């Protein structure tokens, strides 16, 4: 166990005793804290590297666009925490880093984003085993995903093309995570 896990266990035990939580509630509290700390550390590492490479703003634009769609569309997750770190750094830091030095035609990115929209229309929301989506929310999440995707695309036509490419990158990455190839076949 590392330092953070020990502190999480100590605090979860304290909350269990103080609030008279049963073992299941204790495990839920501990898991919630582990997720919060893990996500905070991933964000800290990713954005620290982006600051070091002077691409913080581009990372932020890409990540925010991605999250606007991801919140309702869901999608595939990395198989492990370390893979999540690697994927986050590659997608949200290094791709924008290289994108600022490569002249990619905006029309090409827009065309790819339209293909991504098709992915969102067909596959969103994409549930996982660990994060199933209640049936009553599926239709609403699909509509919101499509609307948010279209809004980001429209906004990308209005703002400066340099920043728009990072917005399109974010939504394109999210649309890729919805594809069935990233979900294992269920038995």
From Swiss-Prot:
GO MF annotation list: peptidase activity
The family this protein is said to belong to: Belongs to the AgrB family.
Designated name of the protein: Accessory gene regulator protein B
InterPro entries attached to this UniProt entry: AgrB (IPR006741)
Gene coding for it: agrB
GO aspect biological process, one term: proteolysis
Pfam family, one: AgrB
E.C. designation(s): 3.4.-.-
Biological function: Essential for the production of a quorum sensing system signal molecule, the autoinducing peptide (AIP). This quorum sensing system is responsible for the regulation of the expression of virulence factor genes. Involved in the proteolytic processing of AgrD, the precursor of AIP.
Single GO cellular component term: plasma membrane
Cellular compartments annotated: Cell membrane
Transmembrane segments: 49-69, 82-102, 106-126, 144-164, 166-186
Keywords on record: Cell membrane, Hydrolase, Membrane, Protease, Quorum sensing, Transmembrane, Transmembrane helix, Virulence
Topology with respect to the bilayer: Multi-pass membrane protein
């Amino acid at each position: 166990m590392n330092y953070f896990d020990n502190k999480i266990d100590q605090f979860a035990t304290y909350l269990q005793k103080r609030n008279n939580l049963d073992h299941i509630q204790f495990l839920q509290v501990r898991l919630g804290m582990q997720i919060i700390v893990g996500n905070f550390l991933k964000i800290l590492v990713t954005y620290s590297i982006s600051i070091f490479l002077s691409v913080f703003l581009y990372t932020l634009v890409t990540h925010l666009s991605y999250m606007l769609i991801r919140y309702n569309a869901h999608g595939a997750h990395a198989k492990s925490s370390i893979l999540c770190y690697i994927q986050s750094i590659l997608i949200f830091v290094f791709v924008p880093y290289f994108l600022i030095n490569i002249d990619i035609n905006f029309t090409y990115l827009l065309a790819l984003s339209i293909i991504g929209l098709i992915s969102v229309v067909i596959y969103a929301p994409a549930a996982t085993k660990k994060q199933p989506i209640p049936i009553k929310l599926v239709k609403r999440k699909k509509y919101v995903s499509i609307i948010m995707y279209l809004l980001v695309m429209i906004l990308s036509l209005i703002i400066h093309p340099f920043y728009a490419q990072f917005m399109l990158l974010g939504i394109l990455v999210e649309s890729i995570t919805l594809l069935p190839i990233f979900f294992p076949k269920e038995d």
